[in-house]
Amino acid sequence: MIIVTGGAGFIGSNIVKALNDKGITDILVVDNLKDGTKFVNLVDLNIADYMDKEDFLIQIMAGEEFGDVEAIFHEGACSSTTEWDGKYMMDNNYQYSKELLHYCLEREIPFLYASSAATYGGRTSDFIESREYEKPLNVYGYSKFLFDEYVRQILPEANSQIVGFRYFNVYGPREGHKGSMASVAFHLNTQLNNGESPKLFEGSENFKRDFVYVGDVADVNLWFLENGVSGIFNLGTGRAESFQAVADATLAYHKKGQIEYIPFPDKLKGRYQAFTQADLTNLRAAGYDKPFKTVAEGVTEYMAWLNRDA
């Protein structure tokens, strides 16, 4: 069995899909379906069982067994960069991850987990997986950073695989439940389909991010499980492309629309990553050599998926 926490969420459900594509269906999905809309991410997938995250954590802390577990993909977390309840964030992202890590170490179960590019904070260069480059801007980024630091202490002595992925700006299918945290491509598509003007912040040609397609993210996760490599790795494309490029690709797909530029909100000033670009040196050195989709390629594929029933 393979366990996927956050398996009804964005990246988790795409990992389940990638496993299904390889013929793997003996999957336990762990999530919190209080937001009942997330079920749509699983409705076309095949899994063996579902468990609520609170029940799962209780069983993990009690040392209960789940049969022959081949790996745990730990994607479950509070991923809102605008959530400022530090106790909630640390319980949900840090303590929970530690419990799961030790459970895996004791049983030598491969543990593959979601870190984040938010660990780098407001950098504009040198997004490198090393302490001197890390300075998160929000408590979400701090919770991810602190767990990475915890993992770094354990990695040299670990007898089983531990790998963390610093996700950059992931976009693609199965993110609709994320609301305001969904990607720009998702929101632009929704606005166009609602007959509204697609909106970007003023200066969006200058805001550049490393936008990585979720299908590529799932592929990297599965490659690492198959190859048993440990460590903490950036997971982006290695390219910074502008929000304007995302909009251009979206409008090109729809063949309509005129961007409306809106003022940059004061509340985001100083807390907004204006530039991200993954340094892929370590990922490539680990042996992962496949190309990543460009924004034009990924957004076009995503638009086709979003509008498949249109």
Curated annotation (Swiss-Prot):
Entry's induction text: By heat shock.
Record-listed substrate binding positions: N169, S180, H187, F201, E202, G203, S204, R209, Y272
Protein's gene: hldD
Cofactor binding, per record: Binds 1 NADP(+) per subunit. NAD(+) can substitute for NADP(+), but enzymatic activity is reduced.
Functional summary from the UniProt entry: Catalyzes the interconversion between ADP-D-glycero-beta-D-manno-heptose and ADP-L-glycero-beta-D-manno-heptose via an epimerization at carbon 6 of the heptose.
One annotated GO molecular function: ADP-glyceromanno-heptose 6-epimerase activity
GO-annotated cellular components: cytosol; membrane
Entry keyword set: Acetylation, Carbohydrate metabolism, Isomerase, Lipopolysaccharide biosynthesis, NAD, NADP, Stress response
Reaction equations catalysed: ADP-D-glycero-beta-D-manno-heptose = ADP-L-glycero-beta-D-manno-heptose
Modified-residue entries (N6-acetyllysine), positions: K267
Note: Essential for E.coli viability at elevated temperatures. Insertional inactivation of the gene by the Tn5 transposon results in E.coli being unable to form colonies at temperatures above 43 degrees Celsius.
Cofactor(s) the protein needs: NADP(+); NAD(+)
Any GO BP: lipopolysaccharide core region biosynthetic process
Domain-level remarks: Contains a large N-terminal NADP-binding domain associated with a modified Rossman fold, and a smaller C-terminal substrate-binding domain.
Protein's UniProt name: ADP-L-glycero-D-manno-heptose-6-epimerase
Subunit composition and interactions: Homopentamer.
pH effect on activity, per entry: Optimum pH is 5.5-9.5.
Lineage: superkingdom: Bacteria
Protein source organism: Escherichia coli (strain K12)
InterPro entries, per database record: Epimerase_deHydtase, Heptose_epim, NAD(P)-bd_dom_sf
Highest classification ranks of the organism: Bacteria, Pseudomonadati, Pseudomonadota, Gammaproteobacteria, Enterobacterales
Temperature sensitivity of activity: Optimum temperature is 42 degrees Celsius.
